[in-house]
A protein has these predicted regions:
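Positively charged n-region of N-terminal signal peptides that target proteins for export
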Residues: 1-4
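Sec-dependent N-terminal signal peptides
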Residues: 7-8
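C-terminal motif of bacterial Sec signal peptides marking the signal peptidase cleavage site
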Residues: 14-15
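Short, low-complexity N-terminal intrinsically disordered segments enriched in polar/charged residues
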Residues: 18-56
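Short helix-adjacent coil turns
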Residues: 57-65
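Mature soluble domains of exported/periplasmic/lumenal proteins and thiol-rich metal-chelating peptides
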Residues: 60, 81, 86, 144, ...
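Short solvent-exposed beta->alpha transition segments
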Residues: 64-111
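Exposed beta-sheet edge and beta->alpha loop/turn motif
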Residues: 108-154
Length: 154
């Protein structure tokens, strides 16, 4: 009986440490107060890059990412044509883009990246979108994506 209780406690402890999301080891989310200065700098850069993409919906002018801001994969995928398609859809459905609200940073221990979650605020109250910016160890954006908003990270 003791072994069973100890085993259950050990499994519970290990299960709370990290979780697997799509085969990747994801640590606990980090609040704004727990972030280091490096994480804070990455958060600011992620905010600026994400805001630049969504502000394109209001201004129709997109400044392409440079090699110091994003990986080659992100630069190739973020063409003005692709962003324009997304912006047309979002402008019709959600109205004008207002701002990004930082929610959390989730460290991805598998590939040593940080995932920054922002809630995208639009003109219409029904807009419930999330912007995720993944920053790698070189302080470059390695992924930028939008999803429907969910309170829990998936």
């Amino acid at each position: 009986m003791k072994k069973l209780i100890i085993t259950c406690c050990l499994l519970l402890f290990i299960g709370c440490k990290t979780k697997n999301v799509n085969g990747k080891k994801i640590g606990k989310s980090v609040d704004l107060t727990e972030m280091s200065t490096v994480d804070e700098a990455q958060k600011s850069k992620a905010y600026e890059l994400g805001k630049r993409v969504l502000m394109t919906c209001n201004t129709s002018k997109f400044t392409p990412f440079t090699k110091s801001e994003a990986t080659d994969k992100v630069i190739v995928k973020s063409t003005p044509e692709n962003i324009k398609k997304i912006c047309v859809k979002y402008s019709l459905k959600y109205g004008l883009f207002k701002d990004l609200e930082f929610v959390e940073m989730v460290p991805n221990k598998t590939d040593n990246t940080n995932i920054f979650r922002f809630k995208a605020l639009f003109e219409y109250a029904k807009a419930n979108k999330e912007l995720r910016v993944t920053m790698n160890s070189e302080n470059k954006a390695s992924a930028i994506s939008t999803k429907d908003w969910k309170d829990e990270f998936e």
